Amino acid sequence: MAFIALGINHKTASVEVRERVAFTPEQLVEALQQLCRLTPSREAAILSTCNRSELYLEQDQLSSDEVLKWLADYHRLSLDELRACAYVHSEQDAVRHMMRVACGLDSMVLGEPQILGQLKSAYAVAREAGTVGPLLGRLFQATFSTAKTVRTDTAIGENPVSVAFAAVSLAKQIFADLHRSQALLIGAGETISLVARHLHDQGIKRIVVANRTLERASQLAEQFGAHAVLLSDIPDELAHSDIVISSTASQLPILGKGAVESALKKRKHKPIFMVDIAVPRDIEPQVGELDDVYLYTVDDLHEVIEENLKSRQGAAQAAEELVAAGTEDFMQRLRELAAVDVLKAYRQQAERLRDEELAKAQRMLVNGASAEDVLAQLARGLTNKLLHAPSVRMKKLTAEGRIDALSLAQELFALDEGAPQDKGLQ
């Protein structure tokens, strides 16, 4: 079996490419089933966020080329374009990569906790799709356990820093006094929830949450004393909004240049600060061409994020060591499982040989042979049959120059432990 982790992220691909490779929640189950049907992958899970799209796969033999081709075809990209920004990790490196992702060590925001929840969602969807088997199931559980240890035993999660925090920090640089500002938040997911919390804690004057469903918007709005509206109400709310932060799973832009131009006229060209955290983007890039709009994408938040990461750098090394230990522990358990399978097969073979010799012994007794002769024949027959296959294989391997096979056999059968010594050499 071969395990691989394959994908793109914020370090290897621009937001333009990432939004083209992103999977919507509605696509995931069908995509997983298609992936297992059309590639050599027996097990599969897909993690798709604004900063990364990754595939975790178990295959009979490592075959990343076919998976890359499937991914390019699925999203209608050229294979060369995808290869230019894709990475592939295999076996132990893939395990380590997945654990680093879960711990936030590979995130744009070092140590951010949201990625673990997103990875758990990816696991749940893969289970729903029926594409998680023994290996991925064990790996996900080991990954979650390691991430929990990292959160508990290091300071990687202290001093909250996230894309949401960075967006609010940037807003504070533009609007020094948030107490007088009004914010329009588009979406109602985890990131927007974090944005709302940070804005609320900063004492912003008013928050409006716009979402596809009013019920979900209301649930979030109630937590922070905000107002809930539908996406169709956005044009009316824009004119009153100093800050607009958007993060939905929409495949098409929600906010266009025309709507923003109209809002600016009503605001008498008072500036609007916008952050588009979504991938694919919620706000048309052309909006950034307007004179009174400060439009930032998730990639533009790097500088703000870097300034808030210094306190986490010390904890990162301790987290890396825990990830290394978690990786080695998982690989050791995999090796032990492989040994269990071999031992099970060997025991079944031995029991079959035992039953054959026992049947012969019973026939000898029926035919009148003495118990002493039957026992002697049973012992000889069982010994010869148990030793036949290993003896033939050992002779063949040594004839081929595999002298190491002798040492391995000696260790395997404990021939150097308690072996009778040749007294003639004493």
From Swiss-Prot:
GO terms for molecular function: glutamyl-tRNA reductase activity; NADP binding. InterPro entries: 4pyrrol_synth_GluRdtase, 4pyrrol_synth_GluRdtase_dimer, 4pyrrol_synth_GluRdtase_N, GluRdtase_CS, GluRdtase_dimer_dom_sf, GluRdtase_N_sf, NAD(P)-bd_dom_sf, Shikm_DH/Glu-tRNA_Rdtase. GO terms for biological process: protoporphyrinogen IX biosynthetic process from glutamate. Its EC number is 1.2.1.70. Coiled coil: none annotated. Keywords: NADP, Oxidoreductase, Porphyrin biosynthesis. Gene3D superfamilies: Glutamyl-tRNA reductase, N-terminal domain, NAD(P)-binding Rossmann-like Domain. It is an enzyme of class 1 (oxidoreductase). It catalyses: (S)-4-amino-5-oxopentanoate + tRNA(Glu) + NADP(+) = L-glutamyl-tRNA(Glu) + NADPH + H(+). Transmembrane segments: none annotated. NADP(+) binds at G187, A188, G189, E190, T191, I192. Belongs to the glutamyl-tRNA reductase family. Catalyzes the NADPH-dependent reduction of glutamyl-tRNA(Glu) to glutamate 1-semialdehyde (GSA). NCBIfam families: hemA. This is Glutamyl-tRNA reductase. It comes from Ectopseudomonas mendocina (strain ymp).
